């Protein structure tokens, strides 16, 4: 378990309850945050439903939806922790994106374009998104090229941005500005708000932990 301070202005009466590290697993599942390392394939809703059934809890919601093809950090809130939705889910996100272009794009051309897109941009949700399709402004705090292969027309980028930024839309706009097609072929989220990859577990790790708890009364997993 990792301790993170989400609200440093909050206080509690020490006469009631106990520190999080001393709470039983039942209390943690009634008011905890789970970070799942989402695999490629299932939807965020499917993953949450599986986790809810596996853990045997009624209230488990997720936020920061990832498309089925995307991987990485998916936030799940247990029980009373759903009250923290606004605090937990409004933080910046960081992604690693793999793009494939319709023509050869030089590093200089791509880096030059990336430089013009840092800061505030207009970002329209895709038609298939779950939110209302309308123009919205978002901020790209970090946007840089990690690696590229000009011959195969592939580029790997890292992006740190506001919550609610649609990377698929950003990829489309990059293609338009370069006068070519640009396909988002892979997307991985490795940071969301105060959480990073070190805070996450896979569904297999969760399955193993639940088995140890139920069959061997071992909650250390």
Question: Would you name each region that the model predicts?
Answer:
Residues 1-71, 77-221:
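Non-catalytic RNA-recognition surface used by pseudouridine synthases
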């Amino acid at each position: 378990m990792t301790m993170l301070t989400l609200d440093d202005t909050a206080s509690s009466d020490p006469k009631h309850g106990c520190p999080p590290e001393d709470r039983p697993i039942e209390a943690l599942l009634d008011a905890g945050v789970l970070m799942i390392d989402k695999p490629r394939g299932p939807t965020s809703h499917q993953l949450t439903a599986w986790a809810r059934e596996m853990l045997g809890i009624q209230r488990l919601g997720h936020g920061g939806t990832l498309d089925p093809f995307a991987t990485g950090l998916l936030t799940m809130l247990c029980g009373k922790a759903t009250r923290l939705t606004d605090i937990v889910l409004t933080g910046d996100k960081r992604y690693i994106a793999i793009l494939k272009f319709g023509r050869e794009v030089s590093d200089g051309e791509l880096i030059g374009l990336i430089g013009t897109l840092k800061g505030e941009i207009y970002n329209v949700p895709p038609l298939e998104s779950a939110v209302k399709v309308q123009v919205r402004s978002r901020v790209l705090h970090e946007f840089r090229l990690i690696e590229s292969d000009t011959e195969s027309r592939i580029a790997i980028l890292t992006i740190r941005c506001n919550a609610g930024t649609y990377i698929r839309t950003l990829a489309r706009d990059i293609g338009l500005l370069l006068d070519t097609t640009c396909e988002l072929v892979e997307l991985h989220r490795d940071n969301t708000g105060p959480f990073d990859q070190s805070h996450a577990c896979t569904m297999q790790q969760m399955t193993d932990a639940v088995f140890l708890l139920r069959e061997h009364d071992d909650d250390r997993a």
